[in-house]
């Protein structure tokens, strides 16, 4: 029986590997929504690092809103300056960058090194657009620490295990370092009394 929309949110939105189904048989629009949920990487706060990703986007939003109204941006009664913004921007851009680099590498190898792909047993059971979607979904799921997959992809090979491990480390642990650095920078700054027009 169908478990409804809540089942999709539990499977795709949580960042803790709690997937309970494989998604190769979903319709194209459903597959796109499943990927989008993981690529946003903060939907409903996620679990665990989802809150830290919210923190990154809040820093960016506070900085932009401060520029729009002509005030020095403040968050939690501390000034947000260029150093915090640079770190937050790098953290926000790292997630899609790692996903796209991994997908581009896999697509390049599939097209230009077919002997290597065949030596690993072949990867794609569904060539064409859906095959590209399977590769994109694999790296998206690794980067979002989700654990699901479009299982038409033969991903239990040396290449996929190593590349997905690298993507997981880069997209999970490097942002945590940046987010903790932002928290440390804000903690060192002087406390500013919160007023009605601050964004706290």
Language-model-derived ranges and their functions:
Residues 17, 76, 136, 147, ...:
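Hydrophobic, well-ordered secondary-structure elements that form the walls
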Residues 82-95, 199:
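Alpha-helical transmembrane segments and their helix-start/interface "positive-inside/aromatic belt" motifs
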Residues 1-9, 197-200:
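Single conserved hydrophobic/aromatic residue that forms the stacking wall/gate
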Residues 149-156:
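Extracellular/luminal re-entrant pore-loop and selectivity-filter region at the outer mouth
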Residues 47, 89, 100, 165-174:
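Hydrophobic transmembrane alpha-helical segments of multi-pass transport and channel proteins
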Residues 106, 175-187:
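Membrane-helix cytosolic exit motif
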Residues 67-81, 182-196:
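Alpha-helical transmembrane segments
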Residues 7-71, 86, 95-134, 141-148:
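Membrane-embedded translocation segments of transport machinery
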